[in-house]
From Swiss-Prot:
ATP binds at V175, G176, Q177, G178, G179, Y180, G181, Q182, V183, K198. It comes from Saccharomyces cerevisiae (strain ATCC 204508 / S288c). Gene3D superfamilies: Phosphorylase Kinase, domain 1, Transferase(Phosphotransferase) domain 1. Residues 470-547 form the AGC-kinase C-terminal domain. The modification Phosphoserine is found at S17, S366. The keyword Kinase applies. This is Serine/threonine-protein kinase DBF20. The modification Phosphothreonine is found at T536. Residues 169-469 form the Protein kinase domain.
Length: 564
């Protein structure tokens, strides 16, 4: 199927390469089904373009013969007994969906390419005809320019067939570190595209059964067209690694903003939580629930607006290892005694929370994770729906205004204890003079987000109608002026991310490196499976190579010339 399509494009290229500039009057096809014959020699021996040839359907007798051959050679067989069971599995459904999207994208892209190539050819022919008729340019010069155009078109055609590779990217600096790999600021060499290149260790992913999470992240990134979600530019793989080249969001994450500001003004907190709701709603509209939202998942772009990233846990379930670990922690703290949650002041709790994040330096980066933002029904392994993301947003709004999460304690165990009895420990913070730290409408929103599923807000429309958002115009939110705009030197400025050449910054990832090295030592080379089906992706926007045509010394930019 693919080779036939490529041959058709090659035939078109062959027809064009035989054109000469002795007769530029190319006959137009007489019908939409018209096809071009290969170029032939005219009576004077000169090459002329192929003439249109109308499509002629085969006779009915031929069609019957063709059908009979199909029925004889491909007689139906009985389906396996487990066919329907296998067909209903989520893994099978994903492959089917990816396959459908792949073929739709493949053929739409191919047809766009053929149409745009014909348009470019007509433009060049008109230009060369003008050169000959108006400026009396010689046929030799015209043919040289035509040959140059053909060379550019062949380059574009070759690029269409090339899959992205690691060597196509220039690594600039490291900007992130995870349990399964690294994130680098990189530049694509042929197009100068700046991206965040996530490189994941295939051995670890297969060893820990995390490939489904990566595939889900890839699927979400390729599906989204929303400005609220980080977009995928390229996805590819080699025997050792999986690669996700995403748009680079240079303003750092919301966690960094909270660390630098400690607390936000009420108006600023309202702006950011509004944008977070928009981003989460964009994910929900795609049919996914994030399940593990935290400040690190929200990035700030160059204009100061929010983008949601890191969709690995949106596959449908959190990993069994993580859930079991958290359930064990919940059980362990069941009978422990801790100081009363409400006895501490806002300032005391704020200090405890920040000290714990410093002393337990891997608190937020651990492979198991912390329970600060995760809804209780997720931790307990119970059934849940998309509103668990609203619980997480309620925790983040709480933290933005007072500087600590609603269930934070002096230790991880105490945090689990507070979460286990959240109805008792969730209290409206008060200042030293006993004034409420939150306005009534702020507290009303928080208690509608951090609530039992039956009492939790059920939709984004309900959220928008709450009095807390009375000043927010959600329709124009993304074009409004944000409280903070990153100060960037250029598009490769990574100053808002950790410096991986700095020992202090690297200390945050000590536990991640230790666990990664331990797992790597356990993985055998034979553990690497075959290629992941439906992983490769190439976006169709932006600069992806040029097939520009020189018109009077200037490059002609064609909207379709970026396809390859």
């Amino acid at each position: 199927m693919f080779s036939r399509s490529d041959r058709e494009v090659d035939d078109l290229a062959g027809n064009m390469s035989h054109l000469g500039f002795y007769d530029l009057n190319i006959p137009k096809p007489t019908s939409p089904q018209a096809q071009y014959r290969p170029a032939r020699k005219s009576e004077n021996g000169r090459l002329t373009p192929g003439l249109p040839r109308s499509y002629k359907p085969c006779d009915s007798d031929d069609q019957d013969t063709f059908k009979n051959r199909i029925s004889l050679n491909h007689s139906p067989k009985k389906l396996p007994k487990d066919f329907h069971e296998r067909a209903s599995q989520s893994k099978t459904q994903r492959v089917v969906n990816v396959c459908q999207l792949y073929f739709l994208d493949y053929y739409c892209d191919m047809f766009d390419y053929v149409i745009s190539r014909r348009q470019r050819t007509k433009q060049v022919l008109r230009y060369l005809e003008q050169q000959r008729s108006v400026k009396n340019v010689s046929n030799k010069v015209l043919n040289e320019e035509w040959a140059l155009y053909l060379q550019r078109e062949h380059e574009v055609l070759r690029k269409r067939r090339l899959k992205p590779k690691h060597k196509d990217f220039q690594i600039l600096t490291q900007v992130g570190q995870g349990g399964y790999g690294q994130v680098y600021l990189a530049k694509k060499k042929d197009s100068d595209e700046i991206c965040a290149l996530k490189i994941l260790n295939k051995k670890l992913l297969f060893k820990l059964n995390e490939t489904n999470h990566v595939l889900t992240e890839r699927d979400i990134l390729t599906t989204t067209r929303s400005d609220w979600l980080v977009k995928l530019l390229y996805a590819f793989q080699d025997p050792e690694s999986l690669y996700l080249a995403m748009e680079f969001v240079p303003g750092g994450d919301f966690r960094t903003l909270l660390i630098n500001t400690r607390i936000l003004k009420s108006g600023h907190a309202r702006f950011y939580i509004s944008e977070m709701f928009c981003a989460v709603n964009a994910l929900h509209e795609l049919g996914y629930t994030h399940r593990d939202l935290k400040p690190e998942n929200f990035l700030i772009d160059a204009t100061g607006h929010i983008k949601l990233t890191d969709f690995g846990l949106a596959a449908g379930t959190v990993s069994n290892e993580r859930i079991e670990s958290m359930k064990i922690r919940l059980e362990e703290v069941k009978n422990l005694e801790f100081p009363a949650f409400t006895e501490r002041s806002i300032e005391d709790r704020r200090k405890i929370y920040h000290n714990m994040r410093k002393t337990e330096i891997n608190y937020a980066n651990s492979m198991v994770g912390s329970p600060d933002y995760m809804a209780l029904e997720v931790l307990e392994g119970k059934k849940y729906d998309f509103t668990v993301d609203y619980w997480s947003l309620g925790c983040m709004l709480f933290e933005s205004l007072v500087g600590y999460t609603p269930f934070s304690g002096s230790s991880t165990n105490e945090t689990y204890e507070n979460l286990r009895y959240w109805k008792k420990t969730l209290r409206r913070p008060r200042t030293e003079d006993r004034r409420a730290a939150f306005s009534d409408r702020t507290w009303d929103l928080i208690t509608r987000l951090i609530a039992d599923p039956i009492n939790r807000v059920r939709s984004f429309e309900q959220v928008r109608k709450m009095s807390y958002f009375a000043e927010i115009n959600f329709e124009t939110l993304r074009t409004s002026s944000p409280p903070f705009i990153p100060q960037l030197d250029d598009e490769t400025d990574a100053g808002y991310f950790d410096d991986f050449t700095n020992e202090e910054d690297m200390a945050k990832y000590a536990d991640v490196f230790k666990r990664q090295n331990k797992l790597s030592a356990m993985v055998d080379d034979s553990a690497v499976d075959s290629k992941l089906v439906g992983f490769t992706f190439r976006h169709r926007d932006g600069k992806q190579g040029s097939s520009g045509i020189l018109y009077n010394g200037s490059e002609h930019s064609d909207p379709f010339s970026t396809f390859y």
